[in-house]
């Protein structure tokens, strides 16, 4: 028994998720570089400070552009991967639907002026992306059981639980940080936001680990 379409699909999905991870790292670095540029010293060495500030902003812009390119490339890779894999398992068809719905929500949120509505649309986009991930894992687990690879299936169950848990924690932290503004609460808000990013990073690592093992499993049987 072989699943050539799923093998191609998972390989592309795995590559896409690595690109997304690199993209998020670029975004974080852009934020750090931007903050450093803003904090550049002033009066005593104005010329040097101005150069440092300008260089920092240029660096931040380059990193943001890299983030955008990586995310677009990752979406295309994911889209192709889902389309490939759906021919071997129905769960990937559902995952594809949520992937498209998520990008639609993201696209609309960019053009919405109302901050509240934009936040809701972004949250719906994040939820769609999470559901897409869940169905990818479910599809791989089903294939793993058909191949008698209970180890992969069990790992998938563990990753599913972790993803759901981290999403709940991330949502709560993001929700709390949204309503904390000004003074001391600004510091608390920043800490909570960083904690949310850390939780999301852990989720990505676990998901990548699962995809890596799944990719190897499918390559062996080809």
Residue spans for each PLM region:
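Membrane-interface extramembranous regions at the lipid-water interface
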Residues: 1-32, 70-110, 124-173, 199-222
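Membrane-helix interface segments in multi-pass membrane proteins
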Residues: 23-71, 105-129, 167-203
